[in-house]
Each structure stands twice: as structure tokens, then as C-alpha cells.
């Protein structure tokens, strides 16, 4: 078996994704390889999407997801769109079904190049998110950062979109908050035994939200698809918006928007947005050493 596999550097709204082709192999991308790849500026990433042979009948692939710190992730909406684009370019297919540790994901590439991913149903039960304390209503829980009488952030909505999320509603631009300071404290708060993704969300109109996310296991990120889904669901649950909104991802590149619909007929959350290929190469999934394909020569690391 060759020591190297093909991989591509891609992004979903700037969310840095490495798509690694592990089909036909029995091994996995190791935590050591993930940490090594993230340490190199050329391959620094938010998530690795490792494509494996399907485990279940009727699925196109098993997707193993790793964070930049080497830990496993249960879901990555932006990364899933990147996988769809890569496989659509390879196979000519437009409709895909993937299996992850969080369950089944269905996705479709549209004629305009955007990609929709059915992220499944949100989970609101406190013990399934999970939380360390019991809350009958997870639309708003008791948690704050800052002085008791004047907290900077407080009373988040919490849920799981395959991974734990806390949504803090704010009245000003999410970029104006020091999320690099508060993010690690909240991600690792005792309330979240499996840690959590932390999102600041602002209502700009009844159909438009603005968000910024500290991603569990990755830190500040340009975009997070499951966080955008969680913000949209929280907005609808708390009466701030209807069930279909546009998400303006504050930290994403220009025109960084996602459309999120929390369908009423089945409670599934469908995310639609772009994916972009940047470059490709080969990588050792055990060590993380890679060679980047270039028009003139190649660069080995």
C-alpha cells in the first residue's frame, strides 16, 4: 500500500478544509498527521474530511472528520459541501449520501454550483447535547461571561447539530466582541462535558442574521456551517425570525453567505452555500508530510 494519498485544499466560505481520499485503504488519517498539517501555513485547516469506502448500503462514502487539534468532529457542514464538490467533479454525480459518526447526510450540487446539505434534525434535550446540568428549556440556559450585574455574554440557546452548539444573541456586530478571549473559556466551560462550538449571532432583519464562531477543536474560524444552522434554528425557536434565513458570516470573505432552512414538514435543517477548490497534492496520512502539486514543479514538506 502506498504511503501517500491524494488530497485537496478547499474552503467553504473561507472555512479551511482538507479533503483526503482514503478510499481503498483500511487505515485512517492520524491525529499526529492532523497536528503536523495544521502546523504548516500551507495546510493550516479547520477540518479534515477523510473520504473512506462506504460502510452502509445506499451511501456513497463514510466521512471521518478531524479538527485541527487532532480530535474527532461529528459534523462539518462546510466540509461536507467541499466533499460534494470534489466527488461531483470526479464522478459527474449531483446527489450524494454520506455516513458520519453523527448519522446520514444527504447533499446535492445545484446547476449554479451551490451545494445543499441536509444536516438532519437539531437535538434540544439537555442530556443529548450534552449539558452538565438539567434544563427543561434549552432555548435559554443560565450561563454568562463577565460581571454578574453586567455580563458581556449571557443566556445562550443550546442544541446539537451532530455536535454541541451554544448561540449567544448580541445587539451589536459580532466582530466587535473579543471572541478570541471568550471563546476558549466557553468552549471548555464545565457546562459542556464534550466542549462546545460558541457562536455570537445578531439579527439584522427578519430574514438575515450575522454570526461569528469559535469552533470546538479549531478556534476562531472564518465560517462554520453547523454553527450557522444552529443560529438559524435558535432564531426561529426564540421568535426572532421565521424558519428560512440568510446567514451573513461576519468573518468570512466578501459575500460570505449561507441560506438555512429549518423545514417545518420534517424538522430537518438544510444548508445551502458555496465550496471552492484551491489546490491539490499528496499526503502521508500517518505523518502528515505532503507534496503540493504546482504548475511548475512541486513543493515537498
Curated annotation (Swiss-Prot):
What Pfam families would the database entry show? Answer: DAP_epimerase
Hey, which family's this protein in? Belongs to the diaminopimelate epimerase family.
A single Gene Ontology CC term? cytosol
Instruction: Kindly indicate whether the keyword Protein transport belongs to this entry.
Output: no
Task: Identify the stretch annotated as signal peptide in this record.
Answer: none
Query: Part of which pathway?
Result: Amino-acid biosynthesis; L-lysine biosynthesis via DAP pathway; DL-2,6-diaminopimelate from LL-2,6-diaminopimelate: step 1/1
Q: One GO molecular function term?
A: diaminopimelate epimerase activity
Entry annotation: catalytic residues:
76 (proton donor), 224 (proton acceptor)
Residues reported to bind substrate: 15, 47, 67, 77-78, 163, 197, 215-216, 225-226
Tell me the Gene Ontology biological-process terms attached to this UniProt entry: lysine biosynthetic process via diaminopimelate
Give the protein's function.
Catalyzes the stereoinversion of LL-2,6-diaminopimelate (L,L-DAP) to meso-diaminopimelate (meso-DAP), a precursor of L-lysine and an essential component of the bacterial peptidoglycan.
Protein name in UniProt: Diaminopimelate epimerase
**Localization terms from the record:** Cytoplasm
Q: How does it assemble?
A: Homodimer.
Q: Would I find Calcium among this entry's keywords?
A: no
Q: What class of enzyme is it?
A: isomerase
Q: Which organism is it from?
A: Rhizobium rhizogenes (strain K84 / ATCC BAA-868) (Agrobacterium radiobacter)
**What reaction(s) does this enzyme catalyze?**
(2S,6S)-2,6-diaminopimelate = meso-2,6-diaminopimelate
EC id: 5.1.1.7
Q: Which PANTHER family match?
A: DIAMINOPIMELATE EPIMERASE, DIAMINOPIMELATE EPIMERASE, CHLOROPLASTIC
Q: Where is this site: Could be important to modulate the pK values of the two catalytic cysteine residues?
A: 165, 215
Main location group? cytoplasm
Swiss-Prot/TrEMBL keywords = Amino-acid biosynthesis, Cytoplasm, Isomerase, Lysine biosynthesis
Amino acid at each position: 500500500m502506498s504511503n501517500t494519498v491524494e488530497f485537496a485544499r478547499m474552503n467553504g466560505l473561507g472555512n479551511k478544509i482538507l479533503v483526503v481520499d482514503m478510499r481503498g485503504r483500511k487505515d485512517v488519517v492520524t491525529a499526529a498527521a492532523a497536528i503536523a498539517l495544521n502546523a504548516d501555513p500551507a495546510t493550516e485547516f479547520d477540518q479534515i474530511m477523510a473520504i473512506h469506502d462506504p460502510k452502509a448500503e445506499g451511501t456513497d462514502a463514510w466521512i471521518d472528520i478531524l479538527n485541527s487539534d487532532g480530535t474527532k468532529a461529528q459534523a462539518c457542514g462546510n466540509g461536507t459541501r467541499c466533499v460534494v464538490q470534489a466527488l461531483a467533479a470526479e464522478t459527474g454525480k449531483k446527489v450524494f449520501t454520506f455516513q458520519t459518526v453523527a448519522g446520514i447526510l444527504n447533499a446535492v450540487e445545484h446547476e449554479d454550483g451551490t451545494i445543499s446539505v441536509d444536516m438532519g434534525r437539531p437535538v434540544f434535550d439537555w442530556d443529548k447535547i450534552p449539558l452538565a446540568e438539567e434544563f427543561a428549556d434549552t432555548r435559554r440556559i443560565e450561563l454568562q461571561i463577565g460581571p454578574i450585574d453586567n455580563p458581556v455574554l449571557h443566556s445562550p440557546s443550546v442544541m446539537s447539530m451532530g455536535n454541541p452548539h451554544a448561540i449567544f444573541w448580541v445587539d451589536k456586530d459580532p466582530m466587535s466582541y473579543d471572541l478570541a478571549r471568550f471563546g476558549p473559556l466557553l468552549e471548555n466551560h464545565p457546562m459542556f462535558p464534550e466542549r462546545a462550538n460558541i457562536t455570537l449571532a445578531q439579527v439584522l432583519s427578519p430574514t438575515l442574521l450575522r454570526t461569528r464562531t469559535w469552533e470546538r477543536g479549531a478556534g476562531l474560524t472564518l465560517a462554520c456551517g453547523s454553527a450557522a444552522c444552529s443560529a438559524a434554528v435558535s432564531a426561529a425557536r426564540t421568535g426572532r425570525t421565521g424558519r428560512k434565513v440568510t446567514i451573513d458570516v461576519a468573518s468570512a470573505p466578501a459575500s460570505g453567505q449561507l441560506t438555512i432552512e429549518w423545514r417545518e414538514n420534517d424538522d430537518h435543517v438544510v444548508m445551502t452555500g458555496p465550496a471552492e477548490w484551491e489546490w491539490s497534492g499528496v499526503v502521508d496520512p500517518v505523518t502528515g508530510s505532503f507534496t503540493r502539486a504546482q504548475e511548475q514543479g512541486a513543493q515537498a514538506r
